[in-house]
Amino acid sequence: PAEDFPEEVKIHGFDNNGAGLVTSGRLMDHYFSAAEEAIRRATQFGARSVSKKYAQRTPFYFRGNDAKGLPKLFQTGRFRFVPETPYTDLYGRHYRGGHIGFLPLYRQGGVPRSGIYTIRVRAAAVGRVHDYGKALGDFRNGDPLVMEIAAVDRRGSVTSTGNVSKMISLARIELTNEEPKWFEWQVYMEAGYEPEVRFRNGPLAAKRMVRVLTTQAAEKPEFKPFINMKPGLEKGHGVLKAYKGPRLRVWEIKVEGPHVEAWPSAGHRALYGDLTPSQLNAKTISRRLEAFAEQAFRRPPHKGELEPIQRLVTNKLREGLKPLRALKLGCQAILCSPGFLYLNLGEGELRGVALASRLSYFLWSSPPDATLLKLAAAGKLRPNLSAQVKRMLADPKSDRFVRHFVRRWLDLDNIGTMPPSADFLEYYRDNLETAMRAETEMFFRNVLDQNLPPREFLDADYSFLNRELALHYGIKGVEGNALKRVSLKGSNRGGLIGQGAFLTASANGVDTSPVVRGIYVLEKLLGYTPPSPPPDVPAIEPDIRGAVTIREQLIKHREIATCAECHRKIDPLGFALENFDAIGGWRETYEAKQPIDATGKLPGGATFKSVSEFRKRLVERQDQFNRCLTEKLMTYALGRELEIGDRPQLDAITARLKHSKTGLRDLVEAIVLSETFRTN
């Protein structure tokens, strides 16, 4: 329901800052629509929902009258044909003909209800080891084949190849089995979506494969009959039928769901309790609105707070609106009221539910659970804050804290907004965007769980990689799609500054800029935001001929008096990372083959000759990093910028980090126990 909401305003990367939250008429329209949709989905009067089964065997493509009215995804196209075998092979990449739709659910407009569905696919990986060499591009010989299950919405925009504008990746698995095997997942799908099987790491688009195989692999006997044949369906089908390279072979797809654990659901009970539509009247509706508001507001409604909504519902009932519709309207109004939309904790010392809410939204990004509310009601939350922090960080819901904080601190949500050019093929082929984010989040999670000191973010000699990310980093011996701890000893990487997400978020997707990366390091690791450049100073234009290096351009730029001081602080930090390209790959030269100079001198006089030495210089400024990290965490926890009055608490917490045994979990606990956190 909230997918069309405009993005929140970010202040220094954080979108939970109250000062930046502005409610517009357009946003209120979205709130009303989302509330109406949420109530519609939660309403479950009537008989228990029955799980349904759907199945489709090969062929997954059709021709002639069988294909009439179907989108091209299901039709035999230029390089698709109805197989004579009991299976269908996928040859190409997922985005160009390398996917299989699911006709039974397409015909009825997707799954009927949102919920958990079981998806089963009978498939195999065929031809992983081949002798086609570079004809298959960068596909690595012997690699597992990656099968992806996606949820797609074909009710909107659909391209000629069957691609859709709304696609959600649900699961991926690596296949090495050459004999058919069933694979099963339980996944959540929204109503109207349907599943799709994709060949995620297919070597080439099918159309291109026919051309490449009959030129670059023309010596292979299986392709000789087609070398001189005119391009067309016969040639395309013949080449692909003779092809012996990597193929994702699919026999059957089954879908079952939605699986209903409780009927009616918790959402339905929150709205209606145990009442049926016939039991709704002015009195029961009033009681339900009171009960629903207490859950929605995360506290009992203030005196008179519900009067406008109760009055609205009463008037609508008098006008003849049916009781069920009147209750829905009242609940919709509650979900669009300030009590629900804003986390209003009051002023002064936080107690009870207010303190429980701040703690829960900090560590779980959700309302307080029954344990917190029970302690709050009994007046026992304050003396038990330490124990609750430990309990909450051990709960899987704390993954939200890790994900939300890390992405806002390091601007990781920006990855993908300026995707790299097609020159960085591996970024798309190996799904590096997802792996990079996961690496940094898992790294943060490890530091938190192990209660390691913040210094770990600066010079840790390990990270969490899968095969694709390790190959991107030039590290051998890592197998599998799952991220695992990997030693970085002997490499140029270590700490945050060697991670792909950090390096990609500080670039623009096309090239690197020492100025942009330098500012990023200053803001994210050292806690200093340089002033904006003077309006009369021209921007640095890259020399696309490659005749002048960026260092030479910046030396010239620093001759401008108004620029010199800031660039003295910024440029060395960016040049230290110049050996990393726009997606974090290692390079020794620029595109014009000019050698990269990653040396530098910091304002304090310390010098470095490489990124490894720069990492040591950062460790020497560990106190500055500790203060920066503490300030970022407090800003996220409080939902506001720190003020002058917060400095004593910031100083006291940061001072604790000078002890080598103080870890990240200790830091989070110290923030929660601080007067600043417990006061609004």
PLM features per residue range, with description:
Residues 1-680:
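Low-complexity, glycine/serine/threonine/alanine-rich intrinsically disordered linker
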